[in-house]
From Swiss-Prot:
Positions of substrate binding: 57, 73-75
E.C. no: 4.1.1.11
Gene3D superfamilies: 2.40.40.20
Family the UniProt entry places it in: Belongs to the PanD family.
Cellular component terms (Gene Ontology): cytosol
Enzyme class: lyase
Protein source organism: Burkholderia cenocepacia (strain HI2424)
Name of the molecule in the record: Aspartate 1-decarboxylase
NCBIfam families for the chain: panD (TIGR00223)
GO MF entries: aspartate 1-decarboxylase activity
The protein's role, per its UniProt record: Catalyzes the pyruvoyl-dependent decarboxylation of aspartate to produce beta-alanine.
Length: 128
């Protein structure tokens, strides 16, 4: 059996550009792409923390070290500059890979869209 699992996540990235007439749907700083294990043309889901919008598109490379998160084409209508978003990708993972210790790549970034940490799991949510 295969399971559809979280593969990659870039958590709380700030939108730096919204380019309605640019080809390609989400340009992501190449450093962030690599850290999250994402590649060009990979399907991604974007969840806008500010307005609740959720949509799918694909990743393209943004300038390395720039902190770029550019929503392009129709995706530009789903956010405003400065909105915080979560960018995620999923993969089909078989039971053997899961048993062997397969883990997602979670990337946490600072206010300038620079990497501040990595994790391979989402912590248990507690009632507090």
């Amino acid at each position: 059996m295969q399971r559809h699992m979280l593969k990659s996540k870039i958590h709380r990235a700030a939108v730096t550009h919204c380019e309605l007439h640019y080809e390609g749907s989400c340009a992501i700083d190449e450093d962030l792409l690599e850290a999250a294990g994402l590649i060009e043309n990979e399907r991604i889901d974007i969840w806008n923390i500010n307005n609740g919008e959720r949509f799918s598109t694909y990743a393209i490379k943004g300038e390395r070290g720039s902190g770029m998160i550019s929503l392009n084409g129709s995706a530009a209508r789903r956010a405003q500059l400065g909105d915080l978003v979560i960018i995620a990708a999923f993969a089909m993972v078989d039971e053997a890979e899961l048993q062997a210790g397969w883990k997602p790549k979670l990337v946490f970034i600072d206010d300038g869209n620079k990497i501040k940490g990595h994790r391979d799991h989402v912590p248990t949510q507690n009632w507090t």
